[in-house]
């Protein structure tokens, strides 16, 4: 289409580093540059705007579930990086108190490893301001952004949608985390039993669903 694609070589070469470079270019060349963010993070109006566009996912999912089953699900799971995917499907069920909304973050090497991207499932994130918005970020005691890790590149990010921060504080959304090893095992399970090859990001949701189902069955 004629656009110039610039790869980012700084830092860990993750979404955080790409956003940093994008914002540097934007503020340097405002006369001929427009900043567009595809995830539900960043300064207003991006979180609200992206969430609204993504809401079609939840609207269609809710309609199709009712047509197929005649009832609403007990739980809705979605992987959470920046949060646009999860905001999309959750919005179809926000007004249904009987439906539990569960976000699945990247647990990486596990709790306590500091090699993960779990902002709300673990206790390592703190409220901060970065990249033009306020939310929970993975950061050190000096407020500098921490390095992150995940087997899934799409979930490897320091912050989370500020709307999710609010919903989590209000108890409207629950967050869990899946480790890299759990994701790899779940990926093989889904391929073997369902004949599907899900993305590593999506597989975080399968891990959480399977673990919670197993826990509920035991109870």
What is the role of each PLM region?
Residues 46-60, 199-204:
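A glycine-rich, Thr/Ser-enriched phosphate-binding loop motif common to dinucleotide/cofactor-binding enzymes
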Residues 63-70:
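Phosphate/pyrophosphate-binding loops at sites that engage ATP/ADP/AMP, CoA/4′-phosphopantetheine
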Residues 1-12:
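A glycine-rich helix N-cap at a beta->alpha junction
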Residues 213-219:
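Conserved small/polar residues in nucleotide/adenosyl-binding loops
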Residues 19-49, 69, 98, 103-196:
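Active-site/ligand-binding loops adjacent to catalytic centers
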Residues 80-90, 111, 202-209:
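Short glycine/serine/threonine-rich phosphate/pyrophosphate-binding segments
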Residues 72-85, 101-104, 215:
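A short, small-residue-rich loop immediately preceding and capping a beta-strand
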């Amino acid at each position: 289409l004629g656009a110039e694609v610039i790869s980012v070589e700084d830092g860990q070469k993750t979404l955080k580093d790409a956003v940093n470079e994008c914002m540097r270019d934007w503020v340097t060349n405002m006369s001929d540059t427009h900043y567009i963010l595809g995830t539900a993070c960043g300064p207003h109006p991006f979180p609200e705007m992206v969430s609204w566009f993504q809401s079609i996912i939840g609207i269609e999912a809710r309609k199709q579930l009712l047509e197929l089953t005649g009832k609403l699900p007990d739980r809705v799971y979605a992987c959470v990086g920046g949060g646009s995917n999860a905001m999309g499907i959750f919005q179809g069920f926000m007004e249904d108190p009987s439906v539990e909304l569960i976000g699945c973050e990247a647990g990486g090497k596990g709790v306590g490893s500091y090699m993960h991207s779990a902002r709300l499932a673990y206790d390592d994130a703190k409220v901060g301001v970065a990249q033009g918005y306020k939310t929970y970020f993975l950061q050190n005691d000096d407020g500098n952004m921490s390095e992150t890790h995940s087997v899934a590149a799409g979930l490897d990010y320091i912050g989370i949608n500020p709307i999710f921060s609010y919903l989590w504080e209000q108890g409207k959304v629950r967050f869990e985390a899946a480790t890299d090893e759990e994701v790899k095992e779940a990926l093989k399970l889904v391929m073997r039993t369902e004949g599907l090859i899900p993305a590593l990001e999506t597989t975080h949701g399968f891990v959480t669903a399977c673990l919670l189902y197993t826990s509920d069955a035991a109870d």
